[in-house]
Amino acid sequence: MGKYFGTDGVRGVANSELTPELAFKVGRFGGYVLTKDKERPKVLIGRDTRISGHMLEGALVAGLLSIGAEVMRLGVISTPGVAYLTKAMDAEAGVMISASHNPVQDNGIKFFGGDGFKLSDEQELEIERLMDQPEDHLPRPVGADLGMVNDYFEGGQKYLQFLKQSADEDFTGIHVALDCAHGATSSLATHLFADLDADVSTMGTSPNGLNINDGVGSTHPEALAEFVKEKGADVGMAFDGDGDRLIAVDEKGNIVDGDQIMYICAKYLKSEGRLTDNTVVSTVMSNLGFYKALEAEGIKSVQTAVGDRYVVEAMKKGGFTLGGEQSGHLIFLDYNTTGDGLLSAIMLMNTIKMTGKPLSELAAEMQKFPQLLLNVKVTDKHKVTENEKVKAVIEEVEKEMNGDGRILVRPSGTEPLVRVMAEAKTKELCEKYVGRIADVVKAEMGAE
């Protein structure tokens, strides 16, 4: 990670860390790096529903116009919507203003290249290098050479049309409950499933600028679980603030995570001959039960570091079509270039419709190992991998496990946290192991 760019773009507390001044520079220098070979390059900008979105959008637009870019504002739209439209509309770049599942005070800026993919480490480092130069030597067009800004709010409809074409058939007879986290999918999801003839019930669809991800969405699926039972729905779909994640709920109110959705879709795609090389790409956070279930179906797996960008890199390198994370970032590379909650929901609905099985039955085919994840607030998250006492306690626990579980300790990519994860035969063992390691992490580098 660089000085400004983390694992998913530039993030921080809006107007404190991520200021309009910084957003202007990110727009100016980021836009230049992505479009320097083009005359009057086209750049798309979308945002989620956070109160700070307008402020940061204005600053970003100013930065882009200052290098002569033609800016098209998409308004409130999901991150994968921006990625899809950037490629579909032959734009030179796309920008999304969002902090995804983070609380409302945070915001972020992430870029997409003209191919719809997130930036490489090299591109991000080049942007940072230019931002940190003592003087700004970028071109400064004047008069008619300055960029212009236009609104293209019809972009959402173009994206919805693409999603509808991804459905194998309509969803007549399926009652779906949607939780849109008061975020970017609040309007999109409702229209999508209604247009596909599903019976739709909604929650988390009343954004007011302040309530995004507040007790709702994919990071709080228990709210949707209650809603599904209350409405008697067949399936529930929970998205996060920017719509790049999906967590599902079955008809009994049980939560179905990204690993389970990936497994269900992988099995279905394999049966249809649409799973390239019968391989799925996942991260080190995926459950042991996920790998065992794939193996039983004759499906291979490739593991990457945590972060959907690393999953996508491995998918592109190997030519694979399905990958994702337990957190609900699922990538169907035949369809879109990044994690897409709405597309993932369509793919899961395809499987439910075509197999005729309820989600509870499909999910039960994968037996999850008990897993516990604890976040420890620390002063310097990057030192955890070098700390000798932390390494020693991890070795002790792994020796005790004797192959019947695993431990993962890693710094968060976006927050000042160390994540301690354990999988074991029982929940009690998970609690014991995680507590033991977390105590050492806290003692060595814990923050107040």
Curated annotation (Swiss-Prot):
SUPFAM superfamilies, alphabetized: Phosphoglucomutase, C-terminal domain, Phosphoglucomutase, first 3 domains
Binding site for Mg(2+): 100, 240, 242, 244
UniProt entry keywords in alphabetical sequence: Isomerase, Magnesium, Metal-binding, Phosphoprotein
GO MF annotation list: magnesium ion binding; phosphoglucosamine mutase activity; phosphomannomutase activity
InterPro entries, sorted: A-D-PHexomutase_a/b/a-I, A-D-PHexomutase_a/b/a-I/II/III, A-D-PHexomutase_a/b/a-II, A-D-PHexomutase_a/b/a-III, A-D-PHexomutase_C, A-D-PHexomutase_C_sf, A-D-PHexomutase_CS, Alpha-D-phosphohexomutase_SF
GO biological process: carbohydrate metabolic process; peptidoglycan biosynthetic process; UDP-N-acetylglucosamine biosynthetic process
Database matches in PROSITE patterns: PGM_PMM
Keyword Protease attached: no
Membrane-spanning ranges: none
Record-annotated active site: 100 (phosphoserine intermediate)
Pfam families assigned to the protein according to its UniProt record, in alphabetical order: PGM_PMM_I, PGM_PMM_II, PGM_PMM_III, PGM_PMM_IV
Cofactor note: Binds 1 Mg(2+) ion per subunit.
Annotated EC: 5.4.2.10
Modified residues (Phosphoserine): 100
Processing after translation: Activated by phosphorylation.
Top-rank taxon, per record: Bacteria
Listed cofactors: Mg(2+)
Enzyme class: isomerase
Family: Belongs to the phosphohexose mutase family.
PANTHER family, per the entry: PHOSPHOGLUCOMUTASE (ALPHA-D-GLUCOSE-1,6-BISPHOSPHATE-DEPENDENT), PHOSPHOHEXOSE MUTASE
General function of this protein: Catalyzes the conversion of glucosamine-6-phosphate to glucosamine-1-phosphate.
NCBIfam families attached to this UniProt entry: glmM (TIGR01455), PRK10887.1 (NF008139)
Protein name: Phosphoglucosamine mutase
